[in-house]
Amino acid sequence: MELEHQTMETFLRWAADIGISDSIDSSRCSDSCLGHSLSVADFPLAGGRGLRAVRELRKGELVLKVPRNALMTTESMVANDQKLNDAVNLHGSLSSTQILSVCLLYEMSKGKKSFWYPYLVHLPRDYDLLATFGEFEKQALQVEDAVWVTEKATAKCQSEWKEAGTLMKELDLKPKFQSFQAWLWASATISSRTLHIPWDSAGCLCPAGDLFNYDAPGDDLNYSEGPESAIQTSSPQPASITNLECRNNEEEAGLNVEIQSERLTDGGFEEDANAYCLYARRNYQLGEQVLLCYGTYTNLELLEHYGFMLEENSNDKVFIPLETSLYSLASSWPKDSLYIHQDGKPSFALVSTLRLWLVPQSQRDKSVMRLVYAGSQISVKNEILVMKWMSEKCGSVLRNLPTSVSEDNLLLHNIDKLQDPKIRLEQKETEAFGSEMRAFLDVNRLWDVIGFSGKDVEFPRRTNRMMSKWRLSVQWRLSYKRTLADCIYYCNEKMNNLLGTLR
């Protein structure tokens, strides 16, 4: 811990030396780039290491300025290394993200000789992005779409690694820096930590700027959306090209309209300042964690690109299997607009499509179509059918999943116990473990490790990493199931109210 503190001080001093500062006073001399507005702090329940306000901050106030020469980009790395520059120029077929990944590994291979060493030593050793999930953690997601996204992310990473292999060999990287595990690390670093820059789609690594933890878009930027209101959709970008903007796409009454976007006060690269400028996105009190918004993401997208998820995420969406004939009726809305909000309310597009789908084809005249596209109820009986169908569909999806909400809650509780080295498990507790917990212990050969000697439990690092990813899988699927359960409750309540009007 003391060594970590010392290396952090070294990094902050190095950052100050190259012009990074949390003060607008350019003449201010300091042995740290922080201290005027921000300081490094630990937030165990809110993202871990982050930045806290050391004074009151006002919305829109500049809180960190990182000059262009301090940004870690492909441009800045090849400019100071002829060997790297010559090798990169011979591989124009590689994507900008692949090139940046190779450059990052090349700098890592230099060790203390790298100009970026004070920054590189503070990068995480491990990440929890979906591409890093093993077979056990992947299957623990349970939901077919989530498993597919994970497999796709892993396959993409493997393909990009193989394509970049020749360049890494030409740079004479040591075998450990050419390995797939090293590539996974570099790819995850770039996916989760880069910020948008206008001259390179791969983005940049921003020393000190990547200490901020994530904040979801505020309520002031979200539209309240239920079956009778406008629909909000979002199209997440890969993390490496996210530019700290949150975009809200609004479709009025099911019609495709021009995208409405609002730039947040978080910041971006400013040409006139020749620096990355980051701003307070709201007012902060002394001691509060200062956060940045990367964009609008579902929890699965956050896991894919960043390696974490949010318990409360107003941008989360749950997709359920729908009949092919239903999709054919939804031509006025994108398929990704047919979803359930995290609070359990079906989206405008999903409800509107169901209203039309549940009307006999012979009765789908112009008057019905006008009501559908206006977002209006066709009839009380039709609305009851819609709510009944949604409730039964969600119930069917829940029943077909391997575990229930209560079982997942218990499993999360047991995982937390395993992760706490101070908690000694009693024999009767381990005997009550469910099949998934037992499978995890079997795979990792941990039955002896969690013995009953009364000593603190210490798992191997690899096991702890696997457990963290497994916990995220269970946490994600639990959120998915809760949304379905909330949708059942919402639909049943609405159905009962509608039935009351018929009496």
What are these regions (language model features)?
Residues 57, 88-94, 124-144, 212, ...:
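Eukaryote-specific, cytoplasm-facing alpha-helical/coiled-coil scaffolding segments in long proteins
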